[in-house]
């Protein structure tokens, strides 16, 4: 997969460091969690799709770490940085053994097809 990202040479030298550091703390928080936990759900308050993913994991008996990045009116810039980092357009972002598997629909599909267990066992 080759996802287009603006080449650094097309950024003015005066803003390169700013762009590189933009909300890096949020990205590092997620990276730390996915290295420490088998399943990580990255979400936001009051999002029904985040709730669906977490409920599906709970019903399947899958323990998971949950990271909350604000709600509809807060921390949207940090969430946007996570979207740009992963390329995934919505929340939740569900990681299994460090791999982004998608959101609520993808979690539900993997559970229904009994594929999530295989990802966790490998």
Role assignments for model-derived ranges:
Residues 73-80:
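Structural motif
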Residues 67-73:
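Short beta->alpha junction loops
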Residues 96-122:
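Non-catalytic, surface beta->alpha helical segment in thiol-disulfide oxidoreductase systems
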Residues 86-96:
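Structural micro-motif
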């Amino acid at each position: 997969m080759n996802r287009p990202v603006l080449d650094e040479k097309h950024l003015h030298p005066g803003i390169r460091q700013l762009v590189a550091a933009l909300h890096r703390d949020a990205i590092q928080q997620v990276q730390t969690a996915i290295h420490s936990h088998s399943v990580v759900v990255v979400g936001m308050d009051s999002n029904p799709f985040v709730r669906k993913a977490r409920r599906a994991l709970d019903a399947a008996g899958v323990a998971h770490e949950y990271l909350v990045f604000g709600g509809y009116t807060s921390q949207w810039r940090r969430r946007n940085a996570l979207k740009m980092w992963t390329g995934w357009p919505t929340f939740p972002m569900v990681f299994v053994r460090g791999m982004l598997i998608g959101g609520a629909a993808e979690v539900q599909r993997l559970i229904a097809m009994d594929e999530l267990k295989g990802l966790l066992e490998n």
